[in-house]
Swiss-Prot record:
Origin superkingdom: Eukaryota
Pathway recorded for this protein: Glycerolipid metabolism; triacylglycerol biosynthesis
Keywords: Acyltransferase, Endoplasmic reticulum, Lipid biosynthesis, Lipid droplet, Lipid metabolism, Membrane, Transferase, Transmembrane, Transmembrane helix
Family statement drawn from the similarity comment of this UniProt entry: Belongs to the diacylglycerol acyltransferase family.
EC annotation from Swiss-Prot or TrEMBL: 2.3.1.20
Keyword Cell membrane appears in the UniProt entry: no
Swiss-Prot/TrEMBL catalytic activity: an acyl-CoA + a 1,2-diacyl-sn-glycerol = a triacyl-sn-glycerol + CoA; 1,2-di-(12R-hydroxy-9Z-octadecenoyl)-sn-glycerol + (12R)-hydroxy-(9Z)-octadecenoyl-CoA = 1,2,3-tri-(12R-hydroxy-9Z-octadecenoyl)-glycerol + CoA
Region (Disordered): 1-23
UniProt KW Membrane keyword: yes
Catalytic EC class: transferase
Topology within the bilayer: Multi-pass membrane protein
Protein source organism: Ricinus communis (Castor bean)
Gene: DGAT2
PANTHER family linked: DIACYLGLYCEROL O-ACYLTRANSFERASE, DIACYLGLYCEROL O-ACYLTRANSFERASE 2
Name this protein carries in UniProt: Diacylglycerol O-acyltransferase 2
Length: 340
């Protein structure tokens, strides 16, 4: 009997070791700069195209107002208004090629390193809901998950973003080609039904109200919409955390209850931020995007509030666990995460 028990224990240990070895073998790390080498010129050009559109618009309007006749200035304003509403061909070959260039060179500026706990857990014939945190000033690390970066085995990916993005001239074209789309429930549901995996940033712009220096904030407790949609569609939830993203800009925001009331009223946090030489270009600080294992979600067309809260709790717990297990590995051993 004793020999049999020892034999069983040895088998259990062997199986346990095999599972651990398999997990390690499925763990994937990809550094953007090693995969897509760049230089200062290409990196800064890509970043300027990606996030400099708003500044370009304002600069052009300002220069036009100062140096051109008033009728010409009005023509330029009218042109921008047209760009706000003109339909976009999201499958444009030129646009897609531009954004492939932008994504790959911009990521290599920092660089961004993608960590996937189990690459074999993702299948090209399935759609997933990625919950990405934190938002920070800009969620720049999310670009490493796009199909332009071409690491995850998911050929159809979309990032859900605020509707305000799609009313901004030039920016709406570039970000649409880069895979961003409007964050409405109707759009979200239709994309999942069509086989698209969707990346959601649950904390959204409101998360920036609570940003703190030296720690990370995830505004999740009141965010159940993405969980409900995942349940209604029966799509796995995937926790994702980006380490270092909060360091690519220096920022300042006023404190106090009055500021919070104003920010909530305008649905925007008017923070002051700056990067390279005080510009809008982000600092060259490394980021690590860690993708956890999918949480299987049973399809439930009409989940109750309690059922949604239960699955939301599973997601939050998985995100916290992901954060704690990887923070030392990527150089942030003392960093803390607060869930609000």
């Amino acid at each position: 009997m004793g020999e049999e028990a020892n034999h069983n224990n040895n088998n259990n240990n062997i199986n346990s070791n095999d599972e651990k070895n398999e997990e390690k073998s499925n763990y994937t790390v990809v550094n953007s700069r090693e995969l897509y080498p760049t230089n200062i010129f290409h990196a800064l050009l890509a970043l300027s195209i990606w996030i400099g559109s708003i500044h370009f618009n304002l600069f052009l309007l300002f220069i036009s107002y100062l140096f051109l006749s008033f009728p010409t200035f009005l023509l330029i304003v009218g042109f921008f208004v047209v760009l706000m509403f003109i339909p976009i061909d999201e499958h444009s070959k030129l646009g897609r090629r531009l954004c492939r260039y932008v994504c790959r060179h911009a990521c290599s500026h920092f660089p961004v390193t993608l960590h996937v706990e189990d690459m074999n857990a993702f299948h090209s014939d399935r759609a997933y809901v990625f919950g990405y945190e934190p938002h920070s000033v800009f969620p720049l690390g999310v670009s490493v998950l796009s199909d332009h970066f071409a690491v995850l085995p998911l050929p159809k990916m979309k990032v859900l973003a605020s509707n305000a993005v799609f009313r901004t001239p030039v920016l709406r074209h570039i970000w649409t080609w880069c895979g961003l789309t409007s964050a409405t429930k109707k759009n979200f549901t239709a994309l999942l039904a069509s086989g698209y995996s969707c990346i959601v940033i649950p904390g959204g712009v409101q998360e920036t109200f609570y940003m703190k220096h030296g720690s990370e904030i995830a505004f999740l407790k009141a965010r159940r919409g993405f969980v409900r949609v995942a349940m209604e569609m029966g799509k796995p939830l995937v926790p994702v955390f980006c380490f270092g993203q909060s360091n690519v800009y220096k920022w300042w925001k006023p404190d106090g209850e009055l500021f919070m009331k104003i920010a909530r009223a305008i649905k925007f946090s008017p923070i002051v931020f700056w990067g390279v030489l005080g510009s809008h270009l982000p600092l060259q600080r490394p980021m690590h995007v860690v993708v956890g294992k999918p949480i299987e979600v049973k399809q439930n067309p009409q989940p109750t509030v309690e059922e949604v809260s239960e699955v939301q709790g599973q997601f939050v717990a998985a995100l916290k666990d992901l954060f704690e297990r990887h923070k030392a590995r990527v150089g942030y051993a003392d960093l803390t995460l607060e869930i609000l």
